[in-house]
C-alpha cells in the first residue's frame, strides 16, 4: 500500500520525538554497538522482533548515554554582506543552495520574505543586515523584506550550534 509522508508530517513526528527526548521525567538513552555486515544489496535486514534479537542487540551494545537535551537543526546560513538571498516561497519544494533565512552576528534568525531588486527587476545583493525583534515584516534600505523568527540563546548556541548547523525553535 502506498503512503504519502508529507514534510508537514515529518516535522510533526520530529517535534514529538524532541518533546519526548527533552522530558526529564522519563529519561531517554542512545546506544552505540558493533557494526554488522548486510547483504550485498545494502538493504537493512528486516527485524524479527523476537526476544533473541533484542538480547543480541543488547549484548552488542558498546556504550549507552543518557540524553540530556536535543534540538532540531538546520544548515547554518550566516548573513553576509553582498550575498543574494531568495524570498521564501511555500510553493517551492527543496531550496537546494538558495538561502532564504539568515543568522545574524547577535544570533537572531530572520526569514527573507522578498529579495531586493534593482530598477530592471534583477536581484541585488543584501547589504543591510536585518536587526530588531519586532514580529512585523520590515524592509531594509537594500530593498529586502525580512521577518524576525527567533534568537538563539548563548546556552543553545554552546549546546547545539556548529559551524555547519544552527538550532531551530
Question: What are these language model-derived features?
Answer:
Residues 1-169:
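Tryptophan-rich substrate-binding surfaces of secreted polymer-degrading and adhesive proteins
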Amino acid at each position: 500500500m502506498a503512503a504519502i509522508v508529507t514534510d508537514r508530517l515529518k516535522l510533526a513526528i520530529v517535534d514529538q520525538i524532541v518533546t519526548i527526548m527533552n522530558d526529564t521525567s522519563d529519561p531517554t538513552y542512545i546506544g552505540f554497538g558493533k557494526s554488522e555486515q548486510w547483504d550485498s544489496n545494502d538493504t537493512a535486514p528486516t527485524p524479527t522482533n523476537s526476544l533473541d534479537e533484542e538480547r543480541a542487540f543488547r549484548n552488542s551494545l558498546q556504550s549507552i548515554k543518557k540524553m540530556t537535551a536535543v534540538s532540531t537543526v538546520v544548515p547554518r546560513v550566516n548573513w553576509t554582506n553582498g550575498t543574494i538571498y531568495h524570498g521564501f516561497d511555500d510553493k517551492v519544494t527543496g531550496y537546494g543552495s538558495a538561502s532564504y533565512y539568515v543568522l545574524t552576528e547577535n544570533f537572531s534568525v530572520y526569514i527573507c520574505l522578498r529579495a531586493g531588486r534593482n530598477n530592471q527587476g534583477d536581484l541585488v545583493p543584501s547589504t543591510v543586515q536585518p536587526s530588531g525583534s519586532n514580529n512585523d515584516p520590515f524592509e531594509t534600505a537594500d530593498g529586502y523584506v525580512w521577518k524576525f523568527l527567533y534568537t538563539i540563546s548563548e546556552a543553545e548556541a554552546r549546546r547545539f550550534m556548529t559551524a555547519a548547523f544552527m538550532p531551530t525553535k
